[in-house]
C-alpha cells in the first residue's frame, strides 16, 4: 500500500480538520494516509487566548511531530497550514528549512505532492500560500498534483493548484460540506495518481 503523509500546522483547528478529513478520504481509497504536525512551541499560548484554538488543542498536540525521515518514507506528501500575509506560517517554514539537505541528494525527487491552506477571507491570498508550498515541492523535484477543474461539482471556487478554505475572522468558520465535496474530488485525483 502506498504511503501518503499529510503534514499540518494548525492554529485555529481548521488545517487539522481538513487534514483529518483528507486522511480519512485517502484511507477510504486504499492509501496508507498518516497525519503529522510541525512543531509549534507557542500553540499553548493561542489555546489560552483563542477559543477556536482551544477546541482542537489536544487533538493537534496528540499528532506525531514530522521529521525528514517521514518524508523519505512517503510516496506522496501533502502540506496544509494557515495563510499569513499570503504565505506559509513561520512554523511550517521552519520545518521546510530543515529539508534543505534533501535538495542535494534529490531524495524527494518524483514523489507526489499536494497542498491546502486555510485563510481569513480571500482565495487570492490563499492561492499565494499554495504557490509557496508548490515552489518548495518543485525545488525538491516533486510532482505537484493540482486540484484542477471539476465540472462535476455544482459550485466550486477553488484555485486549480490546491484547496483554499476561507476561515473568516479568528478562524471561526469551520470547513463546510461544500469544501468536503471539493476535498472528495481532490482525494479521487490524488489516490488515482499514487496508486498507478
Write out the residue ranges for each language-model feature.
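Short, glycine-/small-residue-rich phosphate/pyrophosphate-handling segment
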Residues: 109-155
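N-terminal beta1-alpha1-beta2 submodule of the flavodoxin-like/Rossmannoid cofactor-binding fold
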Residues: 1-107, 153-157, 164-196
